[in-house]
From Swiss-Prot:
Kelch repeats lie at residues 81-135, 137-178, 196-246, 251-299, 302-350, 352-401. Residues 37-83 form the F-box domain. InterPro entries: At3g26010-like_b-prop (IPR056592), F-box-like_dom_sf (IPR036047), F-box_dom (IPR001810), FBXO31/39 (IPR045048), Kelch-typ_b-propeller (IPR015915), Kelch_2 (IPR011498). SMART domains: FBOX. The lineage of its organism: Eukaryota, Viridiplantae, Streptophyta, Embryophyta, Tracheophyta. Part of a SCF (ASK-cullin-F-box) protein ligase complex. Interacts with SKP1A/ASK1, SKP1B/ASK2, ASK3, ASK9, ASK11, ASK12, ASK13, ASK14, ASK16 and ASK18. This is F-box/kelch-repeat protein At3g61590. Coiled coil: none annotated. Keywords: Kelch repeat, Repeat, Ubl conjugation pathway.
Length: 411
């Protein structure tokens, strides 16, 4: 692992330019002859705006403190839209929680390979449900599971969603979100988005059967719709789901009577009619191999799973990590983690944290702040810079999630 430390204690929030108090004094004749000169004063606003749009997103906030003119430029709606259109795209960041009972932590920028001190809006503890898409991040509490917030963690803008329908108390819940990427050039800041909730609850007195319901929130109508009410036999829902190309994928887990430990359900959100039962298992997709756990993610509208590969004789014991892409109903292997990286985590449990977007996958062990990245295009594994989060006691857990840093999108 690379041991170089690289982080900045830089709290993220919009920075408002406050002009310093001017100092008045008499100038000498020599001083009066010298005039201050700034190169950017020669540039028209549109050209300066274009130059600033090539800065990394972390530098945009610092640019706003240079002078009033720069602050007005980087705060304008036109600049925010142009910045998001810039060919020098921002890669997804990874947020790592500092402690289990605090929403603060550090965010990692893989382009300049630096960590930033970062506070999240809305969320209270690290065990909340998290889902992200196109700059927006959804948070849902892990207790009552009825407090849902949608936010832009960079600008700190957020809103509260109304309580979803269905069982008030569930055994398992999976949340995902998707921002409508169609017509991106038009009204980028107010693009519509959806939030899905998959609820799973055991049928009273029957461990073999589980009630499962799917609920979808639309930001356009600001309402929830119940899409599916079904009863699964021998399977239950879990906490893993994602939306790709308007198809909701979520993992299900065997409760006995199946050769598969895990499975995948695909539900087309645009073709589901009135809530009905018996339809979910028709779209069952088996896992690529025996997995200890699986993490679903949307990478450029492709469904990707990062899974722990179990031993042949002991499938619950992890021996490696693989990455697959779903094509139709078949899994195509993209990569397997080299053993030197797998062993670099130290002790690796059968379950772990992994998330990704664009073409970048993050993998993190719950027992260590070490963070590994995998570039899907370059097929390249790389450790992140050392995170400033340190392990303070043996049973301390580490977790996090990735999101796209965007300035222009609002919940």
């Amino acid at each position: 692992m690379e041991a170089e430390t690289s982080w900045t204690n830089y709290p993220y929030s919009y920075i408002t330019y406050v002009p310093e108090a001017e100092s008045y004094r008499e100038q000498s004749d020599d001083e009066a002859k010298v005039e201050t000169f700034s190169m950017d004063s020669l540039l028209p606003d549109d050209l300066l705006e274009r130059i600033l749009s090539f800065l990394p997103i972390a530098s945009i906030f610092r640019a706003g403190t240079v002078c009033k003119r720069w602050n007005e430029i980087v705060s304008s709606r036109r600049f925010l839209c142009n910045f998001s259109n810039n060919s020098v795209s921002q890669r997804p960041w990874y947020f790592m929680f500092t402690t289990t009972d605090d929403p603060s932590g550090y965010a990692y920028d893989p382009i300049i390979r630096k960590w930033y001190s970062f506070d999240l809006p809305c969320i209270e503890t690290s065990n909340w449900f998290v889902a992200s898409s196109c700059g927006l991040v959804c948070f849902m509490d892990n207790d009552c599971r009825n407090k849902i917030y949608v936010s832009n963690p960079i600008t700190k803008q957020w809103r509260t969603l109304i309580e979803p329908p269905g069982h008030k108390s569930t055994d398992y819940t999976a949340m995902s979100t998707s921002v409508n990427r169609a017509n991106q050039a038009v009204n980028r800041a107010n693009r519509s988005y959806s939030v899905s909730i998959v609820k799973s609850k055991q049928v009273p007195g029957n461990f073999f059967q589980w009630d499962l319901s799917i609920h979808l929130y639309s930001s356009e109508t600001m309402t929830w719709t119940t899409l599916v009410n079904d009863v699964l036999s021998g399977w239950r829902g879990g906490n893993e789901s994602v939306i790709c190309n308007n198809v909701l994928y979520f993992m299900i887990y065997s409760t006995g009577g199946s050769d598969h430990r895990h499975g995948l359900i695909a539900s087309n959100l645009s073709s589901i009619g009135s809530p009905s039962s018996g339809i979910l298992m028709r779209s069952f997709i088996p896992m690529p191999c025996s997995l200890t756990c699986g993490r679903l993610m949307n990478l450029r509208e492709r469904l990707v799973i990062v899974g722990g590969i179990g031993k042949h004789d002991r499938p619950e014991v992890i021996k490696g990590i693989g990455i697959w892409v779903l094509k139709g109903k078949e899994w195509v292997e993209m990569a397997k983690m080299p053993q030197r990286f797998f062993q670099g985590f130290g002790e690796f449990d059968e379950v772990f944290a992994s998330s990704g977007t664009d073409d970048l996958v993050y993998i993190q062990s719950y027992g260590s702040p070490a963070l590994l990245t995998f570039d899907m295009n370059l097929k390249y594994w790389r450790w992140s810079q050392k995170c400033p989060v340190t392990k303070k006691f043996p049973l301390q857990l580490f977790t996090g999630f990735c999101f796209e840093p965007r300035l222009e999108i609002a919940p």
